[in-house]
Amino acid sequence: MVRLAAELLLLLGLLLLTLHITVLRSSPLQHGNDTVSLEQDSRVAENNVNADSSSSVQLGPGDRQTRVAHIPASQPWAQSPGTGGSLQRDGPGAFLLDLQNFPDLSKADINGQNPNIQVTIEVVDSLEGSEPEKGMRKENKPGWAAPNWRNWWQRSSSSSSSSVSTPKGPEEQDYPYESNTEDSNFLKPLGDWERRVKSEAGAGSRTQTEYDYIDGEGDWSAWSPCSVSCGNGNQKRTRSCGYACTATESRTCDMPSCPGIEDAFKTAATEVSLLAGTEEFNATELFGVDTDSCERWMNCKSEFLKKYMSKVATDLPSCPCFYPTEVAYSTADVHDANTKRNFRWKDASGPKEKLEIYKPTARYCIRSMLTLESTTLAAQHCCYDDSMKLITRGKGAGTPNLISTEFSADLHYKVDILPWIICKGDWSRYNHARPPNNGQKCAENPQDEDYYKQFEEAREF
């Protein structure tokens, strides 16, 4: 009997102890402690969000940014999509009830010390710009080859293009890409797809000038019109040779003779015919080149020849001491100090001149051109060595042409070339009758030793 009473008392004590433990678990003190713990956790999470916000990239007005953060589920707070950016705290009871509505969290064990739960929170300033920014978030660093890198540059650059139209508000700014010279970077010209993107983006804007920079040398342009309408002139053409570089090429152009030039030479031609005693100018009879004797040609002292040679000496310019390089590209004016006039010269070094035969030591030659002021049909002929110095004597020296090639190439051959052939290339006898010009008193070229050597060779030949 006593034993039965003891067992009953022990069972009653266990029931009281169980009841006491149940009452303690459901007491308000426990809820208060949980609330304090949750508030402390929420403050820590809020500080973390502020730290992340301060370290994020600052964007201008109208820009959107998506923030992604991972936090433990023991921090009972969340950002509502409709709110501007302030954090909302819920009571612990409401949080526990709402937690059951999430399929992924309904079976989570929240009684553990560190529950393995991750919550994704998106901080969105505006719903308008969420889609474009998702495309930018796919890359960790800017890719310069991506089609939309220019849009990113336009937003991040502090200096925007002047072609952007009326400024918009922060929420309606769409940043269309337009540009002037910044668009055509010579280091990376626009590709075809970039041109299409630009034309679509700026369909409603004004037309922009596109510059195509050529890497290296481009195609030559068409030749420009001749600089003169009659006579001898020049024309040019250009091409691009890179950034801020233009190559220019020029050439001579021969137009029909200017009106009046035939009249200017008519008197001289008539005088030649009259003095020769024939109706036509016969060079072979005048200079006696129809014979095989070089002496007869050298001793021809007709009155016409004396008068003509006197006019040639005063009418023609003196040879420049150095080859005028501008003549190599086109005709050029060179000032003559003796006559105090400008004379027009052209190059005479081409293959048809046959310098290796008639002027064997010459590298360059020039010939004066006829003008309306000319009183004869003659032209000055000057030749230069490899160092562009005037050859004043010897077998390479130039001699005056009594008939210019401009007037008649056939007469020039009969009067100026054929006598040299009749003399069998003996330049010493030819130059005696047609002395080379050195009116500007240039230094003797070649030197005495070379000159005498050439003279002896001519005599022996």
Curated annotation (Swiss-Prot):
<keyword id="KW-1015">Disulfide bond</keyword>
<dbReference type="Pfam" id="PF00090">
    <property type="entry name" value="TSP_1"/>
</dbReference>
<feature type="region of interest" description="Disordered">
    <location>
        <begin position="73"/>
        <end position="92"/>
    </location>
</feature>
<dbReference type="Pfam" id="PF03782">
    <property type="entry name" value="AMOP"/>
</dbReference>
<dbReference type="InterPro" id="IPR051867">
    <property type="entry name" value="Angio_Inhib/Adhesion_GPCR"/>
</dbReference>
<feature type="domain" description="TSP type-1">
    <location>
        <begin position="215"/>
        <end position="259"/>
    </location>
</feature>
<feature type="compositionally biased region" description="Polar residues">
    <location>
        <begin position="40"/>
        <end position="58"/>
    </location>
</feature>
<feature type="domain" description="AMOP">
    <location>
        <begin position="286"/>
        <end position="449"/>
    </location>
</feature>
<dbReference type="InterPro" id="IPR005533">
    <property type="entry name" value="AMOP_dom"/>
</dbReference>
<dbReference type="GO" id="GO:0035162">
    <property type="term" value="P:embryonic hemopoiesis"/>
</dbReference>
<comment type="similarity">
    <text>Belongs to the isthmin family.</text>
</comment>
<dbReference type="GO" id="GO:0030218">
    <property type="term" value="P:erythrocyte differentiation"/>
</dbReference>
<dbReference type="GO" id="GO:0001525">
    <property type="term" value="P:angiogenesis"/>
</dbReference>
<feature type="region of interest" description="Disordered">
    <location>
        <begin position="40"/>
        <end position="62"/>
    </location>
</feature>
<keyword id="KW-0325">Glycoprotein</keyword>
<dbReference type="GO" id="GO:0005576">
    <property type="term" value="C:extracellular region"/>
</dbReference>
<comment type="function">
    <text>May specifically influence certain angiogenesis process.</text>
</comment>
<keyword id="KW-0732">Signal</keyword>
<feature type="compositionally biased region" description="Basic and acidic residues">
    <location>
        <begin position="131"/>
        <end position="141"/>
    </location>
</feature>
<dbReference type="InterPro" id="IPR000884">
    <property type="entry name" value="TSP1_rpt"/>
</dbReference>
<feature type="disulfide bond">
    <location>
        <begin position="230"/>
        <end position="258"/>
    </location>
</feature>
<feature type="signal peptide">
    <location>
        <begin position="1"/>
        <end position="26"/>
    </location>
</feature>
<dbReference type="GO" id="GO:0016525">
    <property type="term" value="P:negative regulation of angiogenesis"/>
</dbReference>
<dbReference type="InterPro" id="IPR036383">
    <property type="entry name" value="TSP1_rpt_sf"/>
</dbReference>
<protein>
    <recommendedName>
        <fullName>Isthmin-1</fullName>
    </recommendedName>
</protein>
<feature type="disulfide bond">
    <location>
        <begin position="226"/>
        <end position="253"/>
    </location>
</feature>
<dbReference type="GO" id="GO:0140374">
    <property type="term" value="P:antiviral innate immune response"/>
</dbReference>
<dbReference type="GO" id="GO:0071425">
    <property type="term" value="P:hematopoietic stem cell proliferation"/>
</dbReference>
<feature type="glycosylation site" description="N-linked (GlcNAc...) asparagine">
    <location>
        <position position="282"/>
    </location>
</feature>
<feature type="disulfide bond">
    <location>
        <begin position="241"/>
        <end position="245"/>
    </location>
</feature>
<keyword id="KW-0964">Secreted</keyword>
<feature type="region of interest" description="Disordered">
    <location>
        <begin position="128"/>
        <end position="188"/>
    </location>
</feature>
<feature type="glycosylation site" description="N-linked (GlcNAc...) asparagine">
    <location>
        <position position="33"/>
    </location>
</feature>
<feature type="compositionally biased region" description="Low complexity">
    <location>
        <begin position="156"/>
        <end position="165"/>
    </location>
</feature>
